[in-house]
Amino acid sequence: MLILAIDTSTAATSVAVLGATAGPILRTQIDGRRHAEVVAPLLREALREADVDPADIGLVACGVGPGPFTGLRVGIATAIAFGFARDVPVVGVCSLDVTARAAVRDLGTSVTVLSRARKSEVCWASYDDRAMRIAGPIIRREPVNITGACVGDAGPVDEVRYPSALDLAELVVERMA
């Protein structure tokens, strides 16, 4: 099944196509103020490079945050509109779960993902070394109960990471299995 994935929950706008014969395709642009301007061109580029007709997409996956409202609204609206137009299911996934999955895979350890929330607040969640959530998501001024490496885009992190639409699509496939 061809999956289109979209995440705009952070400063990154990320679009991916998974399941195409051309292989997995990922397009990402980091600019937290231009989600609305870049999501459609990235979507078009990803579909074109994957050599996929939009009518062939069988599922749309969308990162649902937590994150800034404007960015979330752009990604969720784009995913729902695409799904509605193509009459295919749309599934939402916590963007912290997506970031954690990739970080645990790459670092081989438990992680805490920190993401910008409202004003001076941070949203965080902790994950074990299998990327299973063990705490959170919680919004606070400062994270507590930090487990393992800290990754994300807010606060004191060991590594800045944004959710990847390709990791989002792969996580949806894992959860459907």
Regions found by a protein language model. Name each.
Residues L59-G92:
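DPxDG-like acidic metal-binding loop motif
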Residues V38-P41, A77, A81, V98, ...:
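Short amphipathic alpha-helical face segments that pack within enzyme cores
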Residues A12, P68, K119-E121:
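Glycine-rich nucleotide phosphate-binding loop and flanking beta-alpha elements
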Residues R48-D51, F84, V104-R105:
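Residue-level signal for alpha-helix termini/capping positions
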Residues A22, T28-R34, V88-R175:
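Surface "functional belts" at beta-alpha junctions
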